[in-house]
Amino acid sequence: MAKRKTRRRRKSNTMNKKYILLLAGLIIFLVNFFGEKFGEIQNKSLPEKTYKVLYVSDGDTLTVDDGGSKRKLRLYGIDAPEKTQTYGLESKEFLLNKIRDKNIEVTFISKDRYGRDISVIYLENENINELMVREGYAWWYKEYAKDDFIYGEYEKKAREKKKGLWSKSNPVPPWEYRKNKKTKK
């Protein structure tokens, strides 16, 4: 009888080892398969470097001092009204008053077709990109940040509270404004 229990235990231990190896293999596969995406998500949330703000072009574009040279940043996930558009100057002024002559932390996401660094900026640990949407000075730019639903939540709340540009009736999104401007030329 003692021999049977030993055999069963050995079989059980062998099966456990096989499951552990299978599970370890699955974990390695998943890490390799999703690792790049996971890295992108992490990079988006960790500021990389501090820069001095030189000037603000509009509600979603600014220039910083990069050790003596200028670096143009386009805020990730948002689209602010154009300067010539209703609420464009207010959007620019809000951003300017928030970050003028300040040191901001920047997380770089990518480059756009104009060579600007698509970035998330932070001032004293506050995500300024999110702030622009939360306070009604920019739209959630779904086309380029479709998975970042927090911007959508902030936009919805700003609309409900009629904050910023949402205090106007039927504000025109910047992408539509630019498209209409092109077709008129």
Language-model features: where?
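Small beta-barrel nucleic-acid-binding modules, primarily SNase/OB-fold domains
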Residues: A2-K185
